[in-house]
Amino acid sequence: MEASAPDRARRGWRRARAAASPLSRAAVVLLLSALVLRAPPSVGYLDRLPRSFHLTQESAKIVGSPNFPVKVYVMLHQKSPHVLCVTQRLRNFELVDPSFQWHGPKGKIVSENSTAQVTSTGSLVFQNFEESMSGVYTCFLEYKPTVEEVVKNLQLKYIIYAYREPRYYYQFTARYHAAPCNSIYNISFEKKLLQILSKLVLDLSCEVSLLKSECHRVKMQRAGLQNELFFTFSVSSLDTEKGPKPCAGHSCESSKRLSKAKNLIERFFNQQVEVLGRRAEPLPEIYYIEGTLQMVWINRCFPGYGMNILKHPKCPECCVICSPGTYNSRDGIHCLQCNSSLVFGAKACL
């Protein structure tokens, strides 16, 4: 069977390695640097919807139910939706002389509270929702349906949960033809590659971390032994306030920044193949092996938070604070059962 063009090219590159010039090690560094200079300063966001989404909207209004507690999800450190002290039915009626009173995990809520406010119409609003504010909230409503009728009482319960975006990151693996495994040139190349990748995603408030780097001798099919570097690295998003540039708005979502970083890194490795394919001189001793870049999308929750599509169907990809009776001690995905846990956001089972 006739070999494909990429296979023929790779075999040609391997034969050319034997004739590599003494300057080839320096050439690969220059090659990588040139690729970074060729990379565009910005790449458009993916058109697909982000894996995470915000439930917190200032315009949203949530009504209660007389039959069961209503779940409310508020992103950590963000403003909450308006939690109304009425049912959907009462919202469409006039209420005469209504009186509202809210109680939370720390007792009665007064309108003068700086973090949790009760509006003149009885709505509960949080300006900067903290983890410790998660819990059961109860509203007591007194009203008359009409002036002539007697006072009626209604009690509505809400369970308000803090939630956060998952700790998304991409894990990449890539292979390079290498110098002998005991060569210092491999170590030098590794450092340079990480510097270039880090610079590539710096303006996106993302960081590159090397997870593993190994050198192995590989027996090729119908060929001899060759040295290869196996790189495993991750790309994760930083808090926007920790990045080099201020960021605000919808474009700052970690999933969007990571998608853009992924595109830049994939383009960087593709350009290495393109540049090597156009070279007339012998190949450098260390170079990327076409087709070996692999990527896996990984998400984790912060300690004290977890995902549960059955318990939180309205926020399936959110890391919701662990309820009493559960905990998450590490950056796992789910809250685990712990009967001795009595608080929201438990990070240990004591």
Swiss-Prot record:
Major site of localization recorded for this protein: cytoplasm
Species of provenance: Sus scrofa
Pfam families reported for this sequence: EGF_Sp38_C, Sp38
Function: Plays a role in acrosome compaction and sperm morphogenesis. Is implicated in sperm-oocyte interaction during fertilization.
Residues carrying sugar: 113, 186, 339
Family in the record: Belongs to the zona pellucida-binding protein Sp38 family.
GO CC annotation terms, alphabetical: acrosomal membrane; acrosomal vesicle; extracellular region; zona pellucida receptor complex
Signal peptide positions (record): 1-38
Compartments (UniProt record): Cytoplasmic vesicle, Secretory vesicle, Acrosome; Secreted; Cytoplasmic vesicle, Secretory vesicle, Acrosome membrane
Domain of life from the UniProt record: Eukaryota
Membrane topology field: Peripheral membrane protein
PTM description: N-glycosylated.
Cited PANTHER family: ZONA PELLUCIDA BINDING PROTEIN SP38, ZONA PELLUCIDA-BINDING PROTEIN 1
Expressed in which tissues: Expressed in testis. Detected in sperm cells.
Name of the protein described by the UniProt record: Zona pellucida-binding protein 1
GO BP term, example: acrosome assembly
Keywords of the record: Cytoplasmic vesicle, Glycoprotein, Membrane, Secreted, Signal
